[in-house]
Design a protein with these regions (language model features):
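Alpha-helical interface subdomain recognition
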Residues: 3, 18-23, 33-34, 52, ...
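A short, Trp-centered hydrophobic/proline-enriched beta-strand micro-motif
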Residues: 34-44
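Flexible, small-/acidic-enriched active-site or ligand-binding loops
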Residues: 54, 102-134
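Helix-loop "lid/cap" segments that line or gate small-molecule binding pockets
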Residues: 9-18
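A short, charged helix-loop
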Residues: 64, 123-148
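A short core secondary-structure module
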Residues: 69-108
Length: 262
């Protein structure tokens, strides 16, 4: 559910904060009301993965149009999106381009087979001389602040990690209170209690870091440092917490009847 909210948000916020007035009037109303449109962004590439400064997808100006060519992968909800925000290299800088569904040259590939997050469909995407109006360049002549877009996605994904970790912690904590071994709940065992304490500490620390980064984003401050630190810490935290949750549940942690396995 969180990813289904995040995907359109990574289109809405760049247009809201950096788009031209014409782009805001044309596209933002579609994200509310009865005529809601799905949207997603396309950054990751097969060759360079998540490297926004080495994009092989190109955009060249041709008269009153931009022509985009390249390949993207791991694009969430691409088959259902009415609007895509595609990032491409233009004269050495990374810029965003708004592409509407059905634009000639925009091709959506087969659904990828994910190991996890199976509720979120991801696809490959091809741009074959995809021609869009010149005014669909995000921000118009001014362009977009790519660092700010990346920082916002980092903060959002890290907040999701906090949510995943908290759910795993609460489930394993409640299980430890109920599971009795050798005449007492395993939560009373020091080894389990230490695990739960460390999990709680790391979750709260990450949440506070996420709040600080989000607060600075709302104030339109540079959050490159905070977002980078947060992403690194959140990644390690969520792996540790979910792993400990599986350990606390023992054999039950490997069974899908319990959500920590997922």
């Amino acid at each position: 559910m969180a990813m289904h909210i995040l995907c359109p948000a990574l289109v809405v916020f760049p247009i809201l904060e950096m788009g031209t007035e014409e782009q805001k009037k044309k596209y933002l109303p579609a994200f509310g009301g009865e005529k809601y449109q799905a949207a997603t962004s396309a950054l990751i590439e097969p060759r360079f993965n998540f490297d926004p400064y080495s994009l092989s997808t190109t955009a060249r100006l041709d008269g009153n149009s931009y022509v985009l060519s390249g390949e993207k992968c791991y694009i969430p909800l691409a088959a259902d999106a009415d609007l895509l925000l595609v990032y491409a290299a233009e004269n050495g800088s990374s810029q965003g381009f708004i592409i509407e569904k059905g634009t000639p040259g925009l091709e959506i590939g087969e659904r990828e087979k994910n190991m996890g997050i199976k509720a979120l469909a991801t696809y490959e995407l091809s741009l074959k001389d995809c021609r869009i109006p010149r005014e669909n360049r995000l921000g118009g002549k001014k362009g977009c602040d790519f660092n700010r877009i990346i920082n916002r996605s980092r903060v959002a994904l890290s907040a999701m990690a906090v949510g995943v970790a908290r759910a795993a912690f609460e489930y394993s904590r409640d299980y430890a209170k109920e599971r009795v071994a050798f005449g007492e709940p395993i939560a009373a065992r020091q080894a389990i209690a230490f695990m739960l304490a460390e999990m709680a500490i790391e979750i709260d620390a990450t949440r506070l870091m996420a709040w600080e980064a989000a607060w600075k984003l709302d104030r339109k401050e540079d959050t490159t440092k905070e977002a980078s630190l947060l992403t690194t810490y959140a990644d390690d935290m969520v792996v540790m917490v979910t792993d400990r949750a599986v350990q606390i549940l023992g054999g039950h942690g490997y069974i899908r009847d319990h959500p920590v396995e997922l």
